Design a protein with these regions (language model features):
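Intrinsically disordered, low-complexity terminal tails/loops enriched in metal-binding residues
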Residues: 8-134
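Sec-dependent signal peptide recognition
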Residues: 1-7
Length: 134
């Protein structure tokens, strides 16, 4: 019951789940031959509050993902994203590296494991679909 309530509240208020207003940001989830990235940028280059909140959120998820903790995406989307079971199982073969960008930040995800790569790509495709990323 409590988990259902928390998920409902998170879905109604995604800014609290992620720490920033999604209407003031743009998400990108590019895939590469060895992984991909989660990129979030403030739409207004002068919006320091959004840039700061984006960076804090992405630093947190880079740390959490490296430990196999995908609770933030669960809270944000109300379901576990595609690929997460494999990302958890193969966490020792995946690297998550946070980087600042001019208008926000990025989590670079890399692996040389073919099964982990499939999981990373499944996760990024799910995120792109959910965030209506272009």
């Amino acid at each position: 019951m409590l988990i259902t309530l928390l998920l409902t509240l998170a879905l109604q208020h995604p800014a609290q789940a992620m720490g920033f207003d999604q209407d003031k940001t743009v998400h990108h989830f590019p895939m590469t031959a060895n992984g991909g990235s989660v990129e979030v940028n403030a739409t207004d280059a002068s919006d320091e509050a959004s840039r700061s909140a984006i960076r804090m959120h992405l630093k947190h998820i880079a740390d959490a993902f490296a430990k196999g903790d995908f609770s933030k995406p669960l809270l944000t989307h109300g379901e576990m994203p595609d690929g997460v079971a494999e990302l958890k199982r193969l966490k020792s073969s995946i690297r998550y590296k946070y980087e600042d960008t001019a208008q926000g930040g990025a989590v670079r995800i890399t692996t040389s494991d073919p099964d982990a790569l499939k999981a990373v790509h499944a996760f990024l495709k799910y995120q792109a679909r959910e965030h209506h990323a272009k």
